[in-house]
UniProtKB/Swiss-Prot annotation:
InterPro entries: Herpes_UL49. Its main location: virion. Tegument protein that plays different roles during the time course of infection. Participates in both the accumulation of viral mRNAs and viral protein translation at late time of infection. Modulates the RNase activity of the virion host shutoff protein ORF17 probably to ensure necessary levels of key cellular mRNAs and proteins. Plays a role in microtubule reorganization that occurs after viral infection by stabilizing microtubule network. GO terms for cellular component: host cell Golgi apparatus; host cell nucleus; viral tegument. Disulfide bonds: none annotated. Belongs to the alphaherpesvirinae VP22 tegument protein family. Residues 154-244 are annotated as: Interaction with gE. Pfam families: Herpes_UL49_2 (PF04823). This is Tegument protein VP22. One of its GO terms (biological process) is symbiont-mediated suppression of host innate immune response. Transmembrane segments: none annotated. Residues 1-42, 125-167, 243-302 are annotated as: Disordered. It comes from Varicella-zoster virus (strain Oka vaccine) (HHV-3).
Amino acid sequence: MASSDGDRLCRSNAVRRKTTPSYSGQYRTARRSVVVGPPDDSDDSLGYITTVGADSPSPVYADLYFEHKNTTPRVHQPNDSSGSEDDFEDIDEVVAAFREARLRHELVEDAVYENPLSVEKPSRSFTKNAAVKPKLEDSPKRAPPGAGAIASGRPISFSTAPKTATSSWCGPTPSYNKRVFCEAVRRVAAMQAQKAAEAAWNSNPPRNNAELDRLLTGAVIRITVHEGLNLIQAANEADLGEGASVSKRGHNRKTGDLQGGMGNEPMYAQVRKPKSRTDTQTTGRITNRSRARSASRTDARK
């Protein structure tokens, strides 16, 4: 009976001295707790002292376990700055704090995905399909057809490129040509209005508000345009500041695209209407041959 008590006492002391590695990689003293075992007739029924923990061996294999553990002795290095032997309780605090932080994170994620407007959604680096990507609110919009060519400052021209070789104009081509046509009319109108205003002002400069009103009433420009390539040429020359050649060429023609007014009358732009539908179609298209022909005519007139 004495031997069994001695074995239990040795086992208790050995377990009390056992150290377990902490989360930081250093050894700490295991926490001790009293467990009352089953009553025994050989002792005073106070039980024995052991340790409850994950690394604690069962009482049956305790002797073999500690005999193996004692082959590699370990040096106890307390990690508690207070110097107490039992410093394993702070691990419970760390685990509790970790669980609390994880719970808060899960609650935030649930709130985000249940109500995206309440909390800002975390940005995702990529998506499987590019079409699923949300559009940026401040992303620049695509310019309408023809706006880029007009804003670039290059000479404008109609587009004659159909979608296929045999089909009629389709896709963005009509919108492009409409915008180019309106821009050409605007430039020609601005050039004519400038010349008419200068002529009216030079003929009789206004000296008061009443004369200015009469001048503005008489200087109203009635805008008409000439068809096809002449409109684009006039618009490009007006944009490049070569309106003098346009007016000179207009006076030399029989009908005259641009005619000067007599006296105080402003200059008006007159139009030569096409005779048939085929003329409209042929004049509306611009080719390299027509450009070369118009350039040769201009050189011959000069």
